[in-house]
Amino acid sequence: MIDCCHQHGVLPIVTLHHFTSPRWFSESGGLRRADAAALFAAYVEFVSEILHDVEWIVTINEPNIAALFAGMHDKPAEGEDPISVQMALAGGPDPELAPILAAMHHAARDVLRARTNAKIGWAPATQAFMPTEGNEAKWQEVFYAWEGVFFDATEGDDFIGIQSYTSQPVDANGPVPHPPHPDNTLTGWAYRPDALAINLRRVWELKGIPLLVTENGIATDDDNRRIAYVTGALSGLKSAVGDGVEVLGYCYWSLLDNYEWGSYGPTFGLISVDRAGDFTRTPKPSLAWLGEVAADNADHID
C-alpha cells in the first residue's frame, strides 16, 4: 500500500495501531500485560523495515478510546452495542491504562527514531469538551481524564494528531449525552463543525507542538451537508492558523463509506460502496469538491 501511494503521488500517513490487536495478545491480558510496551516495540521494529520512505507515522490511533474500550470489557449486556456512544459516556478511559499506552507510544517512538527519518506522533480523540455554567472544575477533571493525560505523553513528539468530530458539554456529573435532535449526524453526534477549531486552539495552547488533523468528518447521507460541515471546519481551521496555531495538514475521514461503530450504517465517505452488490465505488460530489479545496489550499474558504 505504501508503494502504491508513492506511485500515485499520495503521501502516506501510516498508523501502526488502530484499535485492532492480535487475538493472542488480547486473550493473554492485552494492554494490561507487563510486557505490553516491549511487545509493541518489537512489532514496530519488525514493520519499520518497510517504513524507510514514510514521512509521517502515528504510533497509536485514539489511545484514550483504546483505554475506554479496554475498560468496558465484559460490561455490555447481551444485545447491547459495546461501542455505542451512550456506553462510552457512562464511564471514561481506564486511568490504569493511560501510562501503559504512553509507554507503548514512547517505546515505538524510540524504535522509529533509530530506524527511520519519519515525523512521529500519536492521535488522541478530542471531544471539544465545554463546561456548562458553574461546572468549570468538573470540566477540568473530565478533560484531563479523557484527553489531558494523553497529551502529557506527547512531550518530545514531532506532531500531535487531532481527531475531531463533535463537541460535548460537561455538567456536574460529567459529559452530557447528545439528546435526540434532527441536526444530529448518523452516529447520533451533535452537528458541530466548529469543534475542530476548539480542539486545535486548545491543544496548541496546552502543548505548543505542531498539529496534524488526522481525522475530521461527518456521518451523513446528505452530501451537501458533508460539504457544509467540512467548509465550517476548515473555516475554523484557517482562523486558528491566522491566530498562530501551527497546523501541518488536514485529513478527511473517510475516503470510503465503511464499517463504522458496529455497522455500515454511518456513512462518512467521500465515495459510496455498493456492499449489497458488486462493491461498485461511486464518487460523491464532495470528493471533487474537497479535491478543489486541497488544490488551492482552501484559499476560497472564508
Please state what every model-predicted region is.
Residues 1-302:
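Non-catalytic scaffold segments within catalytic domains of secreted glycoside hydrolases
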